[in-house]
Amino acid sequence: MLLEQGWLVGARRVPSPHYDCRPDDETPTLLVVHNISLPPGEFGGPWIDALFTGTIDPQAHPFFAEIAHLRVSAHCLIRRDGEIVQYVPFDKRAWHAGVSQYQGRERCNDFSIGIELEGTDTLAYTDAQYQQLAAVTRALIDCYPDIAKNMTGHCDIAPDRKTDPGPAFDWARFRVLVSKETT
């Protein structure tokens, strides 16, 4: 998997307006794994793209009225079938972490990359998702080596607010896949 100017080659691009520049001299050193499903527990629709591009219709589902005002994004989404959608270039600051702290350092958006998995805290993620997440992570480590020792869940950087990627995410499996040499 290759990166060109912050974008994954071959990923579907859906540029989000919800990002800005990282602080001067800041590069990504942390990977944050999230999950998302819109409406909650449903997969495959257009709603994640709509949320991250600020175009979600608050009347399309009762839950959307609660989130339509949010200005959020992630760098990437990995759908259940393994499709990768990229919203923000990796060298820019996506708005995925919110109020957060990692190893005593606040404002995780400044120094992290956020990847969403289409899913829920309690439903097993798919083989395709693990394979793609590992491939993306290896590509990121090639560009940002510190990520290799700094991979965590949203629940770990915002434990009072967030639970994702939840107990369904198999961290050991993910780490084994990341550690495998690329072919």
UniProtKB/Swiss-Prot annotation:
Cofactor names:
Zn(2+)
Catalytic reaction annotation: Hydrolyzes the link between N-acetylmuramoyl residues and L-amino acid residues in certain cell-wall glycopeptides
Keyword set, alphabetical order? Cell wall biogenesis/degradation, Cytoplasm, Hydrolase, Metal-binding, Zinc
Write down the EC number: 3.5.1.28
Cofactor info, note text = Zn(2+) is required for amidase activity.
Q: Give the induction text.
A: Inactivation of AmpD results in AmpR-dependent hyperinduction and AmpD affects beta-lactam susceptibility in the absence of cloned C.freundii amp genes suggesting a linkage between AmpD and peptidoglycan synthesis.
A GO MF label:
N-acetylmuramoyl-L-alanine amidase activity
Kindly state a single biological-process term from the GO annotations of this entry. cell wall organization
Q: Where is this site: Transition state stabilizer?
A: 162
Please report which protein family the annotation says this sequence is part of: Belongs to the N-acetylmuramoyl-L-alanine amidase 2 family.
Give the protein name, as stated in the record: 1,6-anhydro-N-acetylmuramyl-L-alanine amidase AmpD
